């Protein structure tokens, strides 16, 4: 079939398998052209491995450190008549390229929050890898079925203690509009912490540790975004911020747990990028469009692969890691450069419907958004007939 982008709200409902493969290849080429990661990991588990930062971690490990990788994700395969999810195609492409390079690459499709998927992962590590020396936690999910209670909990993006009104960008209609968010209830805050906080990360490490599949010296990191003053009311000081603070709490006990075997645990803070998750946050498209323009002007613009490869090379496995006073690894320091932030803040209130394309890089934002789904990739013929039914050999699919 010939596949064209069809966007509804903040989701593109079509995906392009050849475009997704080309996107993965671009990221692999970036890593291989920038050289190996000294003293990097060799056997890596990535939880949330199919898109965005998790995919970039899998690529950085496999192609920057010659690591064998096991990826966990929740995606949908395509059929002859309907495209699958971008994450499915990304993972198929990653496995193809990693296998060609002689690296082990296997994937588990299912609910990473569940006890069952944790057990399947442990069994697969025991059978195929023995032990892992790095666990990357990169889940972005709107809801979670708690494995102990069976209750399905949802996360909420809301301020705490006050109503907040801010500028938003309607990306469909390409108009600016004010968005008002009512304060979260305590139940909504608790739900957001349960979905996006550190409990599941802790459960994963506990399960892996008890099963004896963590190597001596094993490291773990969970990816997060903190943002700057302009987003704080709905982010750091809101319901999602409470989940981020929970990560900061949980990492302390995980760090103690791994330190007993010479290992370490860190929260890694990454910059704002276009993802399916960030495009759903009302103020992020405008913020990202302004940020992209400013960072491209200063020559510091980065996407997922540049961020994660740099995090691995400089901080996770580097001699002089970028660490903040909370003990987090920081890869977002170029975004938080005071001059960059000052320019974003200065332009924030001056953007109008008429000058949107002049004051911001909304064009770049839209391109990055479509690239998530395999569109707008250089060298891909989007008029060609493609087969949306792409197999992942050896996948362990717990959803069927």
UniProtKB/Swiss-Prot annotation:
Keywords: Fatty acid biosynthesis, Fatty acid metabolism, Lipid biosynthesis, Lipid metabolism, NAD, Oxidoreductase. InterPro entries: Eno_Rdtase_FAD-bd_dom, Enoyl-CoA_Rdtase_cat_dom, FabV-like_NADH_b, Trans-2-enoyl-CoA_reductase. NAD(+) binds at residues 48-53, 74-75, 111-112, 139-140, 244, 273-275. Substrate binds at residue 225. The record marks 75 as: Plays an important role in discriminating NADH against NADPH. The active site is at residue 235. Disulfide bonds: none annotated. The keyword Chloroplast does not apply. GO terms for molecular function: enoyl-[acyl-carrier-protein] reductase (NADH) activity; NAD binding; trans-2-enoyl-CoA reductase (NADH) activity. Its EC number is 1.3.1.9. GO terms for biological process: fatty acid biosynthetic process. It catalyses: a 2,3-saturated acyl-[ACP] + NAD(+) = a (2E)-enoyl-[ACP] + NADH + H(+). Pathway: Lipid metabolism; fatty acid biosynthesis. Monomer. Involved in the final reduction of the elongation cycle of fatty acid synthesis (FAS II). Catalyzes the reduction of a carbon-carbon double bond in an enoyl moiety that is covalently linked to an acyl carrier protein (ACP). Belongs to the TER reductase family. PANTHER family: ENOYL-[ACYL-CARRIER-PROTEIN] REDUCTASE [NADH]. This is Enoyl-[acyl-carrier-protein] reductase [NADH].
